[in-house]
Design a protein with these regions (language model features):
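Active-site-adjacent bridging/hinge elements
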Residues: 104-107, 420
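Long, well-ordered, tryptophan-enriched scaffold segments
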Residues: 45, 62-105
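C-terminal non-catalytic regions of proteins with extracellular/luminal or membrane-system context
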Residues: 3-9, 15-16, 20-24, 29-38, ...
Length: 489
């Protein structure tokens, strides 16, 4: 709920903001079991009720048919009795028809295709560009084919299916390439050994035996790749249940430390949808942040690990050093997890890097951070003028050079700060970015545009977007904390 009304039929959020202020002309669809009232669903902006009294798979509680939906017979009865306006019904129908015609009811829409080689290529490329290199001491990565003859892969996530589970994020793929399969195809079966090391289901395995076997095998390997992280089980990267710990589950942290003690040439690949604590970080020379990369995960992983693809991903969020550095945990239990009924949103607009910047709390890995197998240098940023009107567009440019020996891509970022805001504002905010591909030794002039109206913030008292007449500073950087040059306008 938000301010006492369920979000699926919240008058302020749906009618006032979404449909009136933003001019949204599409259809609002409820979450499964998100509808709770015919009165509110009829008048507060909900257009399509879905999955009432189900979790998407089975009925919850009493028997319930489609006719029992809040927007079915109860709504029809209210319309006939004059309790609900027909104009609201007409609006719902228009929105649903508009959605249909925009999608599958277009007679001229070409036939689609499923699971083609082209789809696989796109999935692999997205995965490759998303992987983030976070640490790479002494050139641990890339591991070129032929560099080692005895490579040990440890970790359940190297073989576990990560397209299924998690609720609504589940994929139904034609095939799924695991990281282990991708690595074996890249380096050859004879060079890759595998052991689980830990398990998410201790009832089926002797946990200590798994750990001891991994430690013993690590001593005999030339290089160790630990592939772990989270999965889509309950209380991890799954809808409906919050995580209960910030640490890696299944004692993975202790296992990483023990593997590193047995073999100093141990690199870590974390597969997860969000951050984890890393007390073991100093004990390993290299770390990659991977994600749930879909059907081609194994090929994407192997291509980046081997150097066939140069990593170019940047962190889409900040990873705090400890849980208490996160804004939601700074204000105590009233902010999270709340009192069982209410959660007080104390941090306001200071979320993620805005919190770390404004409160001067260093992140372990900041928003926008990501390494490469090459190095980039930034020239000084310049703007086309110094004074702008509210309808103008800021044109900025800088030179970006690849100073290394291999091709790569850099996602350059532009942040903006305001000198004297009238309301609380973060130290700076991301306003533009561009990923630039450069060959070894190549340099390019990078140009970006920022409409002045993008500098606006929302004044809740005026209920409008406001651009103050003030001095703003543009910052060009490789991450939210790695600023290369700044220009005031």
């Amino acid at each position: 709920k938000y301010k006492g009304q369920h979000c699926c039929h919240n008058d302020f959020m749906l009618n006032k903001i979404l449909k009136q202020d933003w001019g949204f002309d599409g259809a609002v669809v409820s979450d499964w079991s998100g509808t709770h009232s015919t009165d509110e669903a009829a008048t507060n902006g909900l257009d399509v009720e879905m999955g009432t009294w189900t979790d998407g798979l089975k009925l919850l509680g009493r028997p319930f048919t489609y006719n029992d939906y809040f927007l079915a017979n109860p709504y029809l009865k209210g319309l006939k009795e004059g309790r609900y306006a027909v104009k609201d019904l007409d609006d719902k129908v228009r929105r649903m028809l508009r959605l249909c015609f925009r999608t599958n009811m277009d007679r001229h829409r070409p036939y689609g295709s499923f699971a083609t080689p082209e789809h696989a290529d796109v999935a692999r490329k997205i995965g490759e560009e998303g992987i983030v290199l976070l640490k790479n001491d002494k050139g641990f990565f890339p591991i070129a084919p032929g560099r080692y003859s005895k490579i040990l892969v440890v970790g359940e996530n190297a073989v576990r299916s990560l397209t299924v589970g998690g609720g609504s994020s589940e994929l139904k793929v034609k095939r799924e390439i695991s990281p282990l399969q991708g690595l074996k195809e890249k380096y050859g079966d004879d060079r890759i050994s595998y052991t689980m090391g830990y398990t998410s289901d201790p009832s089926k395995y002797n946990v200590d035996s798994l750990k001891q076997q991994a430690i013993a095998m690590a001593k005999d390997a030339e290089v160790v790749l630990f592939i772990g992280g989270l999965n889509k089980d309950a209380h991890q990267d799954c809808e409906g249940e919050d995580r209960q710990i910030f640490e890696l589950p299944y004692e993975q942290g202790a296992l990483i430390s023990q593997l590193a003690a047995s073999n100093k040439n141990t690199g870590v690949i974390i597969i997860s949808g969000n951050g984890v604590s890393m007390p073991w970080l100093k004990s390993v020379p290299a770390l990659m942040q991977s994600w749930y990369l879909g059907s081609e995960a194994g090929y994407a992983t192997a291509n980046v690990v081997s150097g066939e693809v140069n990593p170019s991903g940047k962190m889409p969020f900040s990873i705090p050093v400890k849980l208490e550095d996160n804004a939601a945990h700074h204000f105590g239990t009233k902010a999270f997890p709340g009192d069982g009924t209410d959660v007080v949103y104390e941090e306001g607009i200071l979320v993620g890097y805005r919190w770390h910047d404004t409160k001067k709390i260093p992140a372990l890995f900041p928003f926008g951070y990501g390494m490469s197998y090459t190095t980039f240098s930034y020239g000084k940023m310049a703007t086309n003028k110094k004074v702008y009107g509210k309808e103008d567009t800021i044109e900025l440019s800088f030179t970006l050079a690849n100073d290394g020996k291999c091709a790569g891509a850099e996602a350059a970022q532009i942040y903006v700060s305001q000198s004297n805001p009238l309301l609380e504002r973060p130290v700076k905010e991301l306003k533009a970015f561009k990923k630039v591909f450069l060959d070894a030794g190549e340099r390019k002039v990078v140009s970006l545009s920022i409409p002045v109206k993008e500098l606006a913030y929302y004044d809740d008292k005026k209920q409008d977007w406001v651009v103050d007449s003030d001095q703003f500073t543009l910052h060009c950087g490789a991450s939210s904390t790695d600023i290369k040059s700044s220009v005031s306008i």
